[in-house]
Amino acid sequence: MKPKIFIDGEHGTTGLQIRTRMAGRTDLELLSIPEAERRNAAMREDLLNSADIAILCLPDDASREAVAMVAGNNRVRIIDTSTAHRVAPDWAYGFAEMDKAQPRKIRDARHVANPGCYPTGAIALIRPLRQAGILPDGYPVTVNAVSGYTGGGKQMIAQIEDDKSPDHIRAPHFLYGLTLKHKHVPEMKMHGLLERAPVFSPSVGKFAQGMIVQVPLYVDDLAAGATIESIHRALVDHYAGQSIVEVVPLEESAKLARIDATELAGKDTMKLFVFGTDGGAHVNMVALLDNLGKGASGAAVQNMDLMLSA
């Protein structure tokens, strides 16, 4: 029998993207709820309990509610795309390239927390340096990022695309999270293996999909002997053999004059770059991805496929 997949929240931005990625797949049976019934709790509960894998594309509280609906059904497995369970110790973190053992953990898990878009880029850069001993305990990590506006969901999409809206956002680029309490910080700290929470400054650009995440470093404050080459080598070694995460060669990065945040829009891959000053005193690590691709829906489908391979 074909595995049954239910996307709870399929009419939202992430849910629609997941549904698009599954279109044409004959190996799955997709369960669906009419948009008019999406708030029908009884119908949702029935579909959740009928699924082999339920993918939750809901706000945090609604995701917790959905998990409770299948609490007594050990057959149903869950992928949650909200922030509700990303630092929960009994949930597998759905960044398959994070560690060599992570694909197996995802494959065998009943509950998988899909990573956030910003943390996907930040953790991809930070964790290999922590594991290689290059980034010391207590280093004051800073993460700067810009995302396509689709990351804000239907509300922000309308605010930017509808110039007749009273809430129309005219600015081509804006900062938010100004209190430095963004909901993605805890997972950056936990899965980035950091002792101190990073200072995270997110922003949104007037483009639909795409993302740049930057982690700047003072080389003199890293482990003794650290260089741009050793930082790059740590990333290369960590992602060796991975098809989704590409570490761009140093010589190729050195030829670049700019990076376009939309380069990977519509793709489920990620590129990592390492840039540095001529004297080697400063390094800037950069992750490039689609906020709706590897940063959300693409990762959810990747995790689903890993779970189905069990």
UniProtKB/Swiss-Prot annotation:
Keyword Magnesium: no
Enzyme Commission number: 1.2.1.38
Family annotation (InterPro entries): AGPR_AS, AGPR_type-2, NAD(P)-bd_dom_sf, NAGSA_dehydrogenase, Semialdehyde_DH_NAD-bd
Enzyme class, first EC level, given as a word: oxidoreductase
Subcellular location: Cytoplasm
Pathway this chain belongs to: Amino-acid biosynthesis; L-arginine biosynthesis; N(2)-acetyl-L-ornithine from L-glutamate: step 3/4
Protein name, as recorded: N-acetyl-gamma-glutamyl-phosphate reductase
Native species: Sinorhizobium medicae (strain WSM419) (Ensifer medicae)
Lineage: Bacteria, Pseudomonadati, Pseudomonadota, Alphaproteobacteria, Hyphomicrobiales
Gene: argC
